[in-house]
Amino acid sequence: MSRSSKKGPFVDPKVFFKVQKAAETGSKEPIKTWARSCTIVPEFVNVTFMVHNGRQHIKVLVTEDMVGHKLGEFAPTRTFKGHGGKGKR
């Protein structure tokens, strides 16, 4: 079930404040965050985030196509090792 439209998108206030501060100073340094549930808003475009995946931080450069998605969608948490095959028997 999706979030109620009357509530609007969830944006972590700390992340939003850091993006605004970086825009004012013109900083291009990545913003480190653990807020995977934060929705990407248009103010985040062309900002680099370091999103935590449970083990390390993954670098994510936000583009216009990502607006409306969550930051955590672009930092996978599970490593796919592949299905069984001839080499795994």
Swiss-Prot record:
Going by the entry's taxonomy, the superkingdom of the source organism is recorded as Bacteria
Cited Pfam families: Ribosomal_S19
- Could you list this entry's UniProt keywords, alphabetically sorted: Ribonucleoprotein, Ribosomal protein, RNA-binding, rRNA-binding
What GO cellular component is one of the record's annotations? cytoplasm
Q: Which InterPro entries match?
A: Ribosomal_uS19 (IPR002222), Ribosomal_uS19_bac-type (IPR005732), Ribosomal_uS19_CS (IPR020934), Ribosomal_uS19_SF (IPR023575)
List the PROSITE patterns.
Answer: RIBOSOMAL_S19
Answer yes or no on keyword Mitochondrion: no
Give an example GO molecular function: structural constituent of ribosome
Gene Ontology BP terms: ribosomal small subunit assembly; translation
Report the family membership.
Belongs to the universal ribosomal protein uS19 family.
Q: What is this protein's function per UniProt?
A: Protein S19 forms a complex with S13 that binds strongly to the 16S ribosomal RNA.
Query: Which PANTHER family does this one have?
Result: RIBOSOMAL PROTEIN S19P FAMILY MEMBER, SMALL RIBOSOMAL SUBUNIT PROTEIN US19M
Task: Identify this protein by name.
Answer: Small ribosomal subunit protein uS19
